Amino acid sequence: MSQKNPEYAADHDHTREEMQNLQVAPASSDVEEPCSSSHLMASSLKGHTSEETQVPEDMEEPCSSSQLLTASNQEDPAYETPSTSRGLQHPYVSSSESAKGLGNKEMQGNSVIPPDQPDLPVMTIDGKVNFLVNYMLYKYQVKEMMSMNDIMTLIVREDEHHFHEILMRASERMEMVFGLEVREVDPVNHFYALFIKLGLTYDGMRADEYSFPKTGLLILILGVVFMKGNRATEEEIWEVLNPMGIYAGMNHFIFGDPRELLTDDFVREQYLAYQPIANSDPIQYEYVWGPRAKAETSKMKVLEFVAKVHGSDPTVFPSQYEEALIEEEERTLAMILEQAGPSSASGESSSDMGSNVPHI
């Protein structure tokens, strides 16, 4: 049976409220939406409110054949530094069109606006966070790094003093929703790249369809299983997912069919194992961590992620924290023994041989 955890139960409502904030905001009616994903994840994480996104005309581009998120799965992407000779790449247009299109629109933006023409709508800070999330997803798809200069020019623009706030909020969403970590890989030239979190090597993206990374949902489910005593029924998992707007049999705009992910993909990829509950009558089934999850990540890493979702520290879950510490110690000891194995075995063998030599 699943283990009850009072600390987890006490904070569960807080987790629901925070995850419910991760929704899509409608576009302002007076602004043409260039792509259905352009207002993705408009609400911020805890502490921020959602605002309508308004996109200035000189930022609007129709989705092209190279639109967001059509690439295949990648584990540790070999990022490329964008060539400056190609010009700045807009996330909604092909590379061959971007420099020309942006250049023409910048020139148009410098023209004098007649006095009777209203000012162009200005993108809010929330809107720029949304735009940056989409830009990050695009860069992850094409395996390219992002430069501070590109982010400033394409997205932040006149709000230079808000750069770090916009980057931090977008990075938090990438982490909590998509399971991707933003790292500054070149501190001198300020280039950033995206990596799958917690040591995992799966993002669930498919080459033949419009797709988003699924790692965030995988980490969340691994967390539910761990917090429930290292085993959870499907009903217990849906009890956590439903308040977040994720339902069995209902297509989700990020995760697709979540039940298919849970019962097929995550099990097939060996991140989860589906097994009968001992002594259950009628027979019932539960999920546990699969061999790939045990090999790639750890209970401590997952607990730290769960604690961050709660806005707390791993120590507020004492039983899970102690269990995670024990696992860390066991892994460290196993690593030491493995590294010292051959010499240790050799020494033991020599000692045994010496003890069998008859004394004269």
From Swiss-Prot:
Residues 9-19 have a biased composition (Basic and acidic residues). GO terms for biological process: negative regulation of transcription by RNA polymerase II. Residues 1-118, 340-360 are annotated as: Disordered. Residues 125-324 form the MAGE domain. It comes from the Eukaryota. Transmembrane segments: none annotated. GO terms for cellular component: nucleus. Signal peptide: none annotated. Residues 63-98 have a biased composition (Polar residues). It holds the Pfam family MAGE. InterPro entries: MAGE (IPR037445), MAGE_WH1 (IPR041898), MAGE_WH2 (IPR041899), MHD_dom (IPR002190). Keywords: Tumor antigen. Residues 341-360 have a biased composition (Low complexity). This is Melanoma-associated antigen B16.
